[in-house]
Amino acid sequence: MKLGLIGKKIGMTRVFTESGNSIPVTVLDVSGNRVVQVKTEEKDGYSAVQLTQGYRRKNRITKALSGHFSQAGVEAGTVIKEFRVDHDIGSDIKIGSEISVELFEVGSKVDVCGISIGKGYAGTIKRHNFSSSRASHGNSRSHNVPGSIGMAQDPGRVFPGKKMTGHLGNAQCTVQNIEVVRVDAGRGLLFLKGSVPGSKGNGVFIRPGVKQPSK
C-alpha cells in the first residue's frame, strides 16, 4: 500500500488542454501535510504513516493530542489521518518532515474519500432513482409514491434493506480512479478531473488508486 495525503476542497474550475478542450476539475489544497508518527511492524504490528494538516491553537486541543504533536515536533493540526503503507515506504519517512503534493504525478489515478453533501430527508425518486408514476389516466395522489413495499400476510413484514425514503447524503464515500490533471507544487494544489465528495472547505483523503484499470 502507498502513502496518501490529506486535502481540503477549494472548489471547481476548468483547465484547457493544448488542443483547446475544456476539462472540469476539482481543486484540492494538500499543502502542509506533516508527519506526526511512523508505525512499524516490529513496534506496532503494522506499517503506517500518520499525517496532519492545517493549524490549530494549543488551547483548542486536548492535553493528550498536544503531547502527541509536541513529541513529533510539529504544530498541532486540525485533522489527523493514518495511511497504511508498505514496510519499505515507512522506513524512508522521517517524523516531522513534510510530504509534498509531488507525491502524485500528472495522469495517475487516485482514490478520494470524503463526506458527501447532505440532502436531508429525500424520497425514493431522488434517493434511489425510482421512476414516478403516471401523471393522469386514473392516477390520483400517487404520482411520487414508491409503490408496494411488501407482499401479503406471508411473510407479513418488510424485508430489511428495502429501498425506501430516508436520509440522503452526509455519509463517507469514496470515488475511485480519478485522473490527476495538474500538480501545482508551488502552491500545494492538486487538480483532479471531475468532482469529488463534499462541499467547499470539506476535508478529503487522497491516495493512489487501489483498483487500477488494466490497459
UniProtKB/Swiss-Prot annotation:
PROSITE patterns: RIBOSOMAL_L3 (PS00474)
Pfam family, one: Ribosomal_L3
SUPFAM superfamilies associated with the record: Translation proteins
Region Disordered, residue ranges: 131-150
A molecular-function term among this protein's GO annotations: rRNA binding
Gene Ontology terms: cellular component: cytosolic large ribosomal subunit
Residue stretches of biased makeup (Low complexity): 131-144
Cross-referenced Gene3D superfamilies: 3.30.160.810, Translation factors
Keyword annotations from UniProtKB, A to Z: Methylation, Ribonucleoprotein, Ribosomal protein, RNA-binding, rRNA-binding
Post-translation changes: Methylated by PrmB.
Positions bearing N5-methylglutamine: Q153
GO biological process: translation
Claim: Ribonucleoprotein is one of the keywords in the record: yes
Family recorded in the similarity comment: Belongs to the universal ribosomal protein uL3 family.
Quaternary structure and interacting proteins, as annotated: Part of the 50S ribosomal subunit. Forms a cluster with proteins L14 and L19.
Function: One of the primary rRNA binding proteins, it binds directly near the 3'-end of the 23S rRNA, where it nucleates assembly of the 50S subunit.
HAMAP family, per database record: Ribosomal_uL3_B
Protein name: Large ribosomal subunit protein uL3
